[in-house]
Swiss-Prot record:
Its EC number is 2.1.1.182. GO terms for cellular component: cytosol. Keywords: Cytoplasm, Methyltransferase, RNA-binding, rRNA processing, S-adenosyl-L-methionine, Transferase. This is Ribosomal RNA small subunit methyltransferase A.
Length: 262
């Protein structure tokens, strides 16, 4: 592996360089030869090499043009990925679907500074993917997989758990990266749910979740006061107890609340 390129702090770059960890990630992602794989932010190709050995159809989406020559050089012995030098947030995943409409496996060591926007884009594309395996800051993964009645349970937990089965499958220490980040990392697995509770208005559901967690220490009654007043709704008629805080509600509770208020 060549490490000639200097990591750019502005892009949140930390290059993975531990071969054992890389092999473990690919193993956990269960990638087969026929899979269509898209790697987000391949950097210098440490993970890409193993993806090329596992699948016949690997695409990479890399925003930083300065790493692409090194990426190609590092992958030379393993194959050639389809390279898209662009921002993943503007990338059209459906352009990769083949004639049989085969769904895509997403994987990547996500830049920590834009991990949330990427996750929300993946939500929009959830009908096009088989699963996703992302390396993220461990604290973020813990928030995503948190259950109700915990301090780390929040907006991200509710929104992602509505769409996916979410699990933390591997913890990763800082020393396997170059340069070393100041935080621990973890692998998040997202698997789209086969069936979801029906929502009357998804955008309104997102808004209700956002408002409910706006001030964590306040009750639902206080956080949703303006919405209830606007709709002239008596809090006692709601399907949830508004004396509770948002962190006490399950994903299903938020669905019921949003549908009632829609």
């Amino acid at each position: 592996m060549q490490y000639k390129t200097k990591a750019k702090k502005s892009l949140g770059q930390n290059f993975l360089q531990d071969e054992n960890i890389i092999r473990k990630i690919v193993q956990l992602a269960n990638i087969k030869k026929h899979d269509i794989v898209v790697e987000i932010g391949p950097g210098l190709g440490a993970l890409t090499r193993y993806l090329l050995s596992s699948s016949n159809n690997v695409s990479v989406v890399e925003f930083d043009a300065s790493v692409i020559d090194t990426l190609i050089a590092n992958c030379q012995k393993y194959g050639t990925p389809h390279i898209y030098n662009q921002d993943f947030l503007k990338f059209d995943i459906s352009s990769l679907e083949n004639s049989s409409n085969q769904k895509i496996k997403l994987i990547g060591n996500l830049p920590y500074n834009i991990s949330s926007p990427i996750l929300f884009k993946v939500i929009k594309d959830s009908d096009k993917i088989v699963d996703a395996h992302f390396m993220l800051q461990k604290e973020v993964v813990e928030r995503i997989v948190s259950l109700p009645n915990s301090k780390s349970y929040g907006r991200l937990s509710v929104i992602l758990q509505y769409h996916f089965d979410c699990s933390m499958i591997l913890k990763i220490p800082p020393e396997v990266f170059y340069p070393q980040p100041k935080v621990d990392s973890a692998i998040l697995r997202l698997k789209p749910k086969n069936s979801k509770e029906l929502l009357k208005n998804y955008n309104f559901f997102e808004e209700i979740v956002k408002q409910s967690f706006a001030q964590r220490r306040k009750t639902l009654h206080n956080n949703l006061k303006s919405i209830l007043k606007e709709r002239k709704i008596d809090p006692s008629t709601l399907p949830v107890d508004t004396n509770l805080r948002a962190e006490n509600l399950s994903v299903g509770d938020f669905v019921s609340l949003a549908n009632f208020l829609s």
